């Protein structure tokens, strides 16, 4: 039997997924069922775009519910000790400077389930995170990105 994929995430990330799941089950699911009922009342389902759209949305909502239930069931919580560290690990915020004289950037490395690059949270599967994980403050690291290679120096890990 194949083992199920685990989803590393913070407690905060798990709670966000649980809230989204609750919203989908209690609100969105009911809204979609109501849209399907209304669309059915329009008659002929073979050329009923409202019905087709509502059924598509229902499939999306049910798929997302299944996905969230699986992620929550297989969540592995990353403990945040709140302490500074010298080593980059999952759940830590790492600040680095692009060399030779670039700007400083900071990212929190999280599991893919809660990654949001616009909020400074990158997936542990991303090229940047893969290059930084396990490295220490002061180390110079070469990162392979889709845009090319960049060299950075790790400034802090929190």
Swiss-Prot record:
The chain's coiled-coil residues are: 3-75
Which terms under GO biological process does the entry name? DNA-templated transcription elongation; regulation of DNA-templated transcription elongation
Q: Known InterPro entries for this protein?
A: GreA/GreB_C_sf, TF_GreA/GreB_CS, Tscrpt_elong_fac_GreA, Tscrpt_elong_fac_GreA/B, Tscrpt_elong_fac_GreA/B_C, Tscrpt_elong_fac_GreA/B_fam, Tscrpt_elong_fac_GreA/B_N, Tscrpt_elong_fac_GreA/B_N_sf
Q: Which domain of life is it from?
A: Bacteria
UniProt entry keywords in alphabetical sequence? Coiled coil, DNA-binding, Transcription, Transcription regulation
Report if keyword Transcription regulation is assigned.
yes
Any one GO MF annotation of this record: DNA binding
Q: Name one Pfam family in it.
A: GreA_GreB_N
* UniProt similarity note: Belongs to the GreA/GreB family.
**PANTHER family according to UniProt:** TRANSCRIPTION ELONGATION FACTOR GREA (PTHR30437:SF4)
Briefly, what is this protein's role?
Necessary for efficient RNA polymerase transcription elongation past template-encoded arresting sites. The arresting sites in DNA have the property of trapping a certain fraction of elongating RNA polymerases that pass through, resulting in locked ternary complexes. Cleavage of the nascent transcript by cleavage factors such as GreA or GreB allows the resumption of elongation from the new 3'terminus. GreA releases sequences of 2 to 3 nucleotides.
Could you identify this protein by its name? Answer: Transcription elongation factor GreA
Instruction: Please name the source species.
Output: Bacillus cytotoxicus (strain DSM 22905 / CIP 110041 / 391-98 / NVH 391-98)
């Amino acid at each position: 039997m194949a083992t199920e994929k685990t989803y590393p995430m913070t407690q905060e990330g798990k709670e966000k997924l649980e809230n989204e799941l609750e919203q989908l089950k209690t609100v969105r699911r009911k809204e979609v069922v109501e849209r399907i009922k209304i669309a059915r009342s329009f008659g002929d389902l073979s050329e009923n775009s409202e019905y087709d759209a509502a059924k598509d949305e229902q499939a999306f909502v049910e798929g997302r519910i299944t996905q969230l239930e699986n992620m929550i069931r297989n969540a592995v919580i990353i403990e945040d000790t709140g302490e500074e560290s010298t080593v980059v690990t999952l759940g830590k915020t790492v600040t680095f400077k692009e060399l030779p004289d670039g700007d400083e950037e900071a990212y929190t490395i999280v599991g893919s389930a809660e990654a949001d690059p616009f909020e400074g949270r990158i997936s542990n599967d991303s090229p940047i995170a893969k290059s930084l994980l396990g490295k220490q403050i002061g180390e110079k690291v070469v990162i392979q990105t889709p845009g090319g290679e960049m060299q950075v120096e790790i400034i802090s890990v929190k």
